[in-house]
Amino acid sequence: MKELKGSQTEANLLAAFAGESQARNKYTYYASKAKKDGYEQIAGLFLETAENEKEHAKIWFKLLHDGMPDTMENLKDAAAGENYEWTDMYAGFAKTAKEEGFDKIAYLFEAVGKIEKEHEERYLKLLANIENNTVFVRDGEVYWQCRNCGHIH
């Protein structure tokens, strides 16, 4: 099979993934607004379409990654993405917004950047738990609640 990396097809897959992902979010926002406005049927159609877009995005994601990466790889990727967002992206966006006189937008970029830092830290802690085999181990007595039925163990 030909090498996908660096090809126009890879660029197209990235664009398709981004487009479908953005459409999914947009349609969920539209669904919320339609529901708030009293249009249940329209809200339902937006949500249905959002789920379709999610599945389309998943097709492109899997092709880009030769399948679905394992959880450790996903945590590493998520942490790296969050790190970029809080160290480079939002910091740079805030600086530009301030320079252009958009102080409120700059504040929002900075505030979201702080949240992204917390996201990175959370992913790194979860990754460490897997690496140290402590996902299901805690000191002292612990109660576990079933995420499906709610039973407490």
Annotate each language-model stretch with its function:
Residues 1-153:
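Non-heme di-metal
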